[in-house]
Amino acid sequence: MPLHHLMIGTWTPPGAIFTVQFDDEKLTLELVKRTEIPHDEPISWMAFDHQKKNLYGSAMKKWTSFAVKSPTEIIHEASLLIGGDPLANSADTNTRAIFLLPAKQAPYAVYANPFYKHAGYGNVFSVSPTGALDQNIQNYPYQPNTGIHGMVFDPTETYLYSADLTANKLWAHRKLPSGEVELVGSVDAPSPGDHPRWVAMHPTGNYLYALMEAGNRLCEYVTDPATHLPVYTHHSYPLIPPGIRDRDPETGKGLYRADVCALTMSGNYLFASARANKFDLTGYVAAFRLRECGSIEKQLCLNPTPTSGGHSNAVAPCDWSDEWVAITDDQEGWVEMYRWKDEFLHRVARVQIPEPGFGMNAIWYD
């Protein structure tokens, strides 16, 4: 079928889920539905369950779930509080639900991370028989100054890896049959200024890729088969052009911050993106060729994105081929579709959605 649908959320209220339609023959993108959701629960990161029958959202002070009947029929079913530190749910704290990872194997629990202050616990939620968020079954500790922004499972879904931006380390946990997790260990990031924000893993489970927000680089790790902890290979790749001015001369603050990384369906390529902290600068998108074992063979490109990316610039490869990659930004509210062909990346379609806080990450429905 030439028609594909993606869902996208917002950084700020009012809460809404936007469904866009991509025609891979006509090469067009259009908004087909704006689904209103609870006003104060905008979704800054969303993910589907293993069957794409439920959509889960990181929604300010809540974790939310929706039944997905079709691309345009999305029904709110649950809003659950952040677990762990009781101050996380206070209206007076800046703690925010930032990321969640639904398991693809039974019991299909959802693993969720708050961010900013009072974010020292990961939350595990069970789901109902239909997949709606049900109970907060575990709040497992990291450390008091933790701020996890991304997680990934190994291919067997036995080990869970977390990128701790504020504590500057990577964590490994073992998943138990109940869906709960237990600590394996942690490793510090290679540099004090790295701040790991995102992790992705090769389908072999041999290699882990850690995106460093402040370091603006992608670091390659091998997973130790005995301990299952990530071991840095001392191979890293730039996510902003080497030599570019990366500090504001007046304030000394960083001008760029790396965002997310994701593999293509085949596992042969990895995309990663970075955002700029000023609207008059551009963000960047990088592509990497991976060897069969999972090690990075070559960085293929480092292209500027149309805007800074704002809070977003999230790169989202489709899940049925290596051909299509969506990129969203919340500086101007664009959804853009890129074609990955012969190891070149080019834009084929875009649509602007001028809504508050649009657009966060895009997820592929079909």
Provide a role label for each language-model segment:
Residues 47, 101, 152, 200, ...:
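Conserved beta-strand position repeated across blades of beta-propeller domains
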